[in-house]
A protein has these predicted regions:
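Long, contiguous interaction/targeting segments characteristic
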Residues: 1-3
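A short, amphipathic beta-strand motif
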Residues: 7-14, 24
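Exposed beta-strand and adjacent loop surfaces of beta-rich binding modules
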Residues: 8, 17-19, 61
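Active-site/binding-pocket entry motifs
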Residues: 17, 107-110, 114-115, 135, ...
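Beta-strand-rich binding/interaction modules
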Residues: 20-22, 64-65
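Short amphipathic beta-strand segments in non-cytosolic proteins
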Residues: 21-48
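A short glycine-rich, aromatic-capped structural motif
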Residues: 27, 45-69, 73, 77, ...
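Functional-site microenvironments in short loops/helix caps that host divalent-cation chemistry
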Residues: 175-297
Length: 297
């Protein structure tokens, strides 16, 4: 039987050697991140389990750190509601692409805002996501493979440059692939077209041998929000210095975007950076509609 303030966690896996560290999420508005720190037990009150298990927990937000025998880690945020059972059916993916996080299938609360605190229960399948924004240098590697001039014009990002006291629309890459200043290869790429973004995904699909695409809106929202009802990746209180936003004095230092992972507080429960600030992300609205929206930033 569950007490009035408790719910049940059921974790199922066929791998009895998996180590699962369970931690209550603490300091939800002030911690740098909410990832489980198994080397700092004083802050996390860790519970270690192996393989499948079930247990009763007080209602609240928790994190699971799942570690396989290769030493790979996956973080799974969970929300325990009083009187309810949260079931996780988990198998470790055989391969995790470089610089990617794995986001486990399941429900999360979408469309949370100051005016809609409860949100809607939305579901996603499991997926991989780049753990930070794509850089200009990475996009340039793809762009150098494009030979047709018409496509080169379409895929070359259009950006506004302040030249001789006027704003002028220019291409990011020159004829010799030179990146026009003030941009550089370490900054997040901006100004790309939908066609350019999808062409880059096709290029990456061939490069890594896995299908790549732009994320759906719900996938990026889940990666940012976790499974609870937080307003921001770090919690519910807005803090302008936690991310590169208009109210942050760091905008003077990074007027055109900062290198990914510059702001450690802008780090989600799943392990993705810059989903609140820095540049915006281009996402598909959903799998059934050929519409695209800009998210975050």
């Amino acid at each position: 039987l569950l007490s009035i303030n408790c719910g049940e966690l059921v974790f199922k896996t066929s791998d009895s050697e998996l180590e699962v560290f369970l931690s209550k999420q603490i300091g939800r508005d002030d911690a740098v991140s909410f990832a489980v720190d198994k080397d700092n037990k004083n802050e996390s009150e860790l519970i270690l389990k192996r393989g499948s298990f079930n247990m009763n927990l007080r209602q609240g937000e928790y994190s699971l750190l799942v570690t396989d025998k290769k030493g790979r880690n996956i973080t799974i945020p969970i929300l325990i509601n009083a009187g309810e059972t949260s079931e996780i059916d988990f198998e470790f993916p055989t391969h995790i692409p470089d610089n990617c996080i794995y986001i486990h299938k399941g429900y999360y609360y979408s469309n949370i805002s100051h005016h809609a605190a409860h949100g809607r229960h939305s579901y996603t399948d499991s997926y991989f996501l780049l753990d930070r924004e794509l850089t200009i240098g990475e996009y340039l590697e793809f762009f150098k493979t494009v030979k047709e001039e018409k496509l080169r014009q379409l895929y070359n990002p259009d950006l506004l440059f302040h030249i001789d006291g006027k704003f002028q629309l220019r291409k990011l890459f020159g004829d010799d692939y030179k990146i026009l200043p003030p941009y550089n290869e370490n900054m997040p790429v901006v100004g790309i077209s939908v066609e350019g973004a999808n062409a880059f995904c096709r290029y990456m699909s061939e490069k890594i041998g896995m299908k790549c695409r732009l994320p759906y809106f719900v996938e990026l929202e889940k990666a940012a929000r976790g499974t609870g009802r937080r307003l921001y990746v770090w919690g519910n209180r807005f803090k302008s210095d936690y991310a590169l936003l208009a109210g942050n004095a760091a905008v003077k230092e990074y007027p055109n975007g900062a290198p990914p992972k510059t702001f450690p507080h802008d780090y989600s429960l799943f392990g993705a950076y810059d989903l609140t600030g820095n540049v915006r992300e281009l996402v598909q609205l959903n799998r059934n509609l050929d519409y695209y929206v800009l998210y975050g930033g």
